[in-house]
Amino acid sequence: MSKVDLWQDATAQAELVRSGEISRTELLEATIAHVQAVNPEINAVIIPLFEKARRESELASGPFAGVPYLLKDLTVVSQGDINTSSIKGMKESGYRADHDAYFVQRMRAAGFVLLGKTNTPEMGNQVTTEPEAWGATRNPWNLGRSVGGSSGGSGAAVAAALSPVAHGNDAAGSVRIPASVCGVVGLKPTRGRISPGPLVTDSDNVAGAAHEGLFARSVRDIAALLDVVSGHRPGDTFCAPTASRPYAQGISENPGSLRVGVLTHNPVGDFALDPECAAAARGAAAALAALGHDVNDAYPEALGDRSFLKDYSTICDVAIAREIERNGELIGRPLTEDDVEWTSWEMVKRADQVTGRAFAACVDELRYYAGKVERWWEAGWDLLILPTVTRQTPEIGELMLAKGTDLEGRQSAFISGSLQMLAFTVPFNVSGQPAISLPIGMSSDGMPIGVQIVAAYGREDLLLQVAAQLEGALPWVARRPQLLNPSRKIPAA
């Protein structure tokens, strides 16, 4: 029996199990051993579910039978398992979810085995994953660097081969930012593509800006995962256009010559775009031009206006306040200032000043901004290429605000100190368009740099076809973080 490298993607792992080259038990036990060896260094998996995984692995059936995955510890829950949203009070309560989210149900139906839950900043309200409840997640490429956020645990886990794929959610870049700084592929699909239900929270609370997303190390895994988890369910607020065929079937096809716009500067001008981030985007653009696409410097004019962030920040304040209230309902007592981080409580105080009419006005402004962004695609452009983040990967602690920091005049605790991380991602949460971060660049100090590609609403098919083209032209699969030991193999039986 041959050995298997845990760096192989989910598609390859599934084929090895299916062909009998390795058993699902061998795959799972090797993955668990790898998590136990590596996770103490990076703190990506905060709630291991190894015994549950062993039970479910024996019963798994479907195209990915026996392949492990990880779930972000935020809003999308698994029955019987601890759920904290990285809230101190929730962790102390020992609360366990009483149902499986639709995402979890669909992953199980495809044969995936839930291995554990990953770290997130408290309620996902930061762009670095350093919650008080669980501690910081560290970047496998450099343990002193951030993994981004808010799906930082999932991004780091996939980068370190703790699982081939993982779940995340994205309200301002929370999948794409960790994908960029951890060197993996991260997809935020079209609004309504993946159901957040049956307990719908972020989908409504962030006015449709929060979307369930996916992490993998290959584009083909992202396509296959999207086929597994896509689809409207009862109670969903939004519904994406139905795909004409499975995404996994279409990614190898040539999409023809497309009109591609490129943005490699900050159109607002309030800070300078990091030169290495810009260079990575230009490299991707050059590769697409060489493949026959019509590539030009062009972008939606709306990206030069960030005034919408004031309204978005108000909506985020209200969303956090409601999440604190809802989590208190789950444990049978109100969560207080002592149960949450100080920045979250500041957001609650701000939310208490928001009237119903003011909130409705903020939603209206976001809808107006979304239309301005989307009209660029309506004018005949197919794709936009731009850096995922606009700065180098921050150090651990760099983006955390010291308690008592004066927030007066800042847009919110959610935005403060983090604009350069999310400036190029949050517009597409508001517009609801699909966007993917690809690990195309490397910085001079050895850190990954992601390049973002954005398609028109509902056009994940086109997005994934072009992502696959770039994966072929600028292969990244051989890159592995220093932490990952390539010799860690599944032992022969």
From Swiss-Prot:
Keyword Hydrolase carried by entry: yes
Keyword Oxidoreductase: no
EC supergroup of this enzyme: hydrolase
GO molecular function: 6-aminohexanoate-cyclic-dimer hydrolase activity
Temperature curve summary: Optimum temperature is 33 degrees Celsius. Loses 50% and 100% of activity after 10 minutes of heating at 45 degrees Celsius and 50 degrees Celsius, respectively.
Cystines in this chain: none
Reaction(s) catalysed by this chain's protein: 1,8-diazacyclotetradecane-2,9-dione + H2O = N-(6-aminohexanoyl)-6-aminohexanoate
GO BP field: nylon catabolic process
PROSITE patterns, alphabetized: AMIDASES
Keyword line: Hydrolase, Nylon degradation, Plasmid
EC number: 3.5.2.12
Pathway: Xenobiotic degradation; nylon-6 oligomer degradation
Active-site residues per Swiss-Prot or TrEMBL entry: 72 (charge relay system), 150 (charge relay system), 174 (acyl-ester intermediate)
pH dependence, record text: Optimum pH is 7.3. Is stable from pH 5.5 to 8.5.
Job of this protein: Specifically catalyzes the hydrolysis of 6-aminohexanoic acid cyclic dimer (1,8-diazacyclotetradecane-2,9-dione) to form the linear dimer 6-aminohexanoyl-6-aminohexanoic acid. Is inactive on 6-aminohexanoic acid oligomers (degree of polymerization 2 to 6), various other cyclic amides, cyclic diamides, linear amides, oligopeptides, and casein. Allows the bacterium to grow on a medium containing 6-aminohexanoic acid cyclic dimer as the sole carbon and nitrogen sources.
The family this protein is said to belong to: Belongs to the amidase family.
Known partners and oligomeric status: Homodimer.
Classification via PANTHER family: GLUTAMYL-TRNA(GLN) AMIDOTRANSFERASE SUBUNIT A, MITOCHONDRIAL (PTHR11895:SF7), TRANSAMIDASE (PTHR11895)
Protein name: 6-aminohexanoate-cyclic-dimer hydrolase
Species in which this protein is naturally found: Paenarthrobacter ureafaciens
